[in-house]
């Protein structure tokens, strides 16, 4: 197994890292969703085209590229719709007529698609609701997975679409979306491609978590070296050293599972991503909680990135059922 990045992959990592470093530091991390202008700028850099399948006009980047980009997003604690809008919805429309209408706009960052599981077709119209649709308030259209498992595309401007805003724990906005007899365009997605899309979205989430873990650990180590108690840096106390070492262990175990999932063969990727999700979400939450503890009361304030990072990790670790759902899937 080759764990080294290719020259092209290293260029992508460095590009994303520089872009985020210009916009985020410890005072701005996770202070709110990425602005539409910054999202479009990433599209102009070709990042979304890289992660979009060739059937939808993209460059067909694979799991390794998803891991690289998502980990950098997580390291900056950037709040973006990458997993759902690009990896799930971008693949849902690939190969269909919807790709002609939405593909370029999605890759350029000019339009946002949101994934909305819920609802049912009744007399050829979509009825029902989808709860907690991430970025649902800003979505131009919805990729809906009905209760029967069919994929449909719904125009967000349809008069039968009703949205109620919901603020999530990390400060980002979601929506409760109701579909009242709306027109829905069927999406024909090969079963293998949809399973791959779900795996890549899951991979993106755990990669974000690993990036966030690395950032929170770095911030914590810097803090305990600077914070003095009894005339010494608290980093000199053995109990603090042991706690930081435990955080590092959680990070490295998580990174190993992430690499295994990203480098798995396509037929084994779904299970490898599920195994990563079964561990990484819980490990990330423990690391974030430990980071808050080592910062003391300041760790839960908005002045420091640590508390905001905890809230971001809390959300990511619970998406799509989190570790509980992943462990249940492995046991099935």
Language model feature labels by segment:
Residues 1-76, 199-332:
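Alpha-helical interface subdomain recognition
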Residues 21-162, 331-332:
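Glycine-rich flavin
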Residues 96-101, 125, 185-189, 266-270:
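Short, glycine- and charge-enriched coil/turn segments that flank and shape catalytic ligand pockets
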Residues 130-135, 156-186:
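Flexible, small-/acidic-enriched active-site or ligand-binding loops
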Residues 190-195:
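The feature captures the short pre-catalytic strand/loop hairpin that immediately precedes
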